[in-house]
Amino acid sequence: MSNESIYSVLDLTQVIFEDRYLVKQKLGDGSFGTVYLAQRKEKNGLYETVAVKKLKNSSKPKPKHELLKLRESLALRKISKHPCLIDLLETFMDPYRNIFLVMEFMDCNLFQLFKRRQGRLFTKETAFNILLQIISGIEHIHKHGFMHRDIKPENILVKRISPKPISSRYSIKLGDFGLARPSVSSDPLTEYVSTRWYRAPELLLRSGSYNHSVDLYAFGCIVFEIYSLKPLFPGRNETDQLNRVCEILGNPGIDELDTLHYWSQAKELAKRLGFMLPPTKPYPIQKLLPQNCPEGHAKMIPCLLAWNPDVRPTAKYCKEVFFPLPPSASKSNSVPQKISNPKVEQNLGFPISREDKKSTRRVGWLKKNLSEFVSSVKSVFPDSHGSQPHVKTEKPINAKESTGHLANPIASSNVPAISLKPGELHESVFFSENEQIDYLLTSIDYLPSYKPPSNGSNIAINAFNETVGDRIPSSKDILITEKIPFKKENEIRDSIVPSCSQPDESNKEGVASCLLLQKSGMEMTSVLEYSTPNPAEVQNICNDHAKFETSKSLHLSSP
């Protein structure tokens, strides 16, 4: 097939990119192109925030390579639209024969959401809803004769919504179909696909024959990660990955009666690679799970992680058996639909720390935790296996930096003084004592060397965590948290400057930043933005502000 015939299959229209799109930021580079955050000009004069992937354009393109580049667009065109799949809005070519894929923009990906959790586990209801949307997307792909082949947290995109019930606060969509291909094809299968931590045993052992069950294995790894906020098999390399799999799933050639953990082909495939599988017995995965994981899902994970791909359940079976819906929910669509947002949001993403973009690794992470299971963690989670939360666990070593996923949020600056933007919530949230005035003061910890007094506690942080719960902080949280009741107390207080009830001489080296927001209808308007090297000045400015005259000092305590 020639390049011209490949392009004709897509029926590409020619568009001058600059005439329709305004690039805001480069999000990252991928194997086949670069992803940008952009705004698309609509006929009604409004702008829509989108993710635009510009495919690489080689000087001497070969038809096979061009077809691989366009695989994502071809797959999304053949698979009908679904609320749990990223929406391909447009595919076009510019006069220079550059091809662009335009997709909806999401707030973040699942990996970034894990990091932002800071070790706080999802509730059962929220985890259930996230997993239901993921398995619904996988089921839809398989139903249309495709396999994704790269299911991982970075390719699961997240948008924060505010429906009721509150457990459905996230809209989840599968993205990055660059490795997707038909389940049945005359072309030979690529052996090296999927990301190592989520790679099925048949892929690790370089089997030339595999099917859609590789997606179910990856889903099993993600189920574990959703409940524990930690990866199950964080291997450093291929050999280490196989060893870690054997530590948990056991040697697949020991017990022929163990359907889940026996696979006769594994030994021969490993021998061909010069690898000897360790003679280990299966470790109960249920003991590695925290208590927020329901019994049904704890039983589902070993089935999904079966050595033998033929005994893994299908996506359809998983959805029907392990994700039963109550009668009231079954009458309506439990999967969040696309949220229409004609108004362009100013806050195109939420801030993430620079740690979110690093890709360092800790050697022997899971193995170390396994050895500490009995001695150090059993007292905390009697029925689970403890380890550090996901926030201290990094991405796979083979995961590229900003690999062109559709949702790479705009990072916040890491300088001492930050001028916060409307909608950004940092570590402290403070409210006016006057309930008739709806204000929000956001601020950051400004003194790395400063320790709060022993009798002072940042009550606002605790109240915010309890109220916001699993949501990604955004301007919408203001409408939910503004009614937190605070009582006056004479002894314990939080001042406007975070964690600093008594500023003194030791504070002079610190830098404080704050933003005062005023509610006006459904919008939050910036009333005051201020940065100063003297935290006491921030407090004075806020106290002297006309709208804060009733709050000379905020005396807050727990509700």
Swiss-Prot record:
GO CC annotation: cytoplasm; nucleus
Binding site for ATP: L27, G28, D29, G30, S31, F32, G33, T34, V35, K53
EC class of the enzyme, as a word: transferase
Catalytic reaction annotation: L-seryl-[protein] + ATP = O-phospho-L-seryl-[protein] + ADP + H(+); L-threonyl-[protein] + ATP = O-phospho-L-threonyl-[protein] + ADP + H(+)
GO molecular function: ATP binding; protein serine kinase activity; protein serine/threonine kinase activity
Keywords for this protein: ATP-binding, Kinase, Nucleotide-binding, Serine/threonine-protein kinase, Transferase
Pfam families named in the record: Pkinase
InterPro entries in UniProt: Kinase-like_dom_sf, MAP_kinase, Prot_kinase_dom, Protein_kinase_ATP_BS, Ser/Thr_kinase_AS
Active-site residues (renumbered): D150
Residue ranges occupied by any Protein kinase domain in the UniProt entry: 21-323
Keyword Kinase: yes
A GO biological-process term: intracellular signal transduction
Its EC number(s): 2.7.11.1
Family according to the record: Belongs to the protein kinase superfamily. Ser/Thr protein kinase family.
Role, per record: Protein kinase which is essential for spore formation.
Descriptive protein name: Sporulation protein kinase mde3
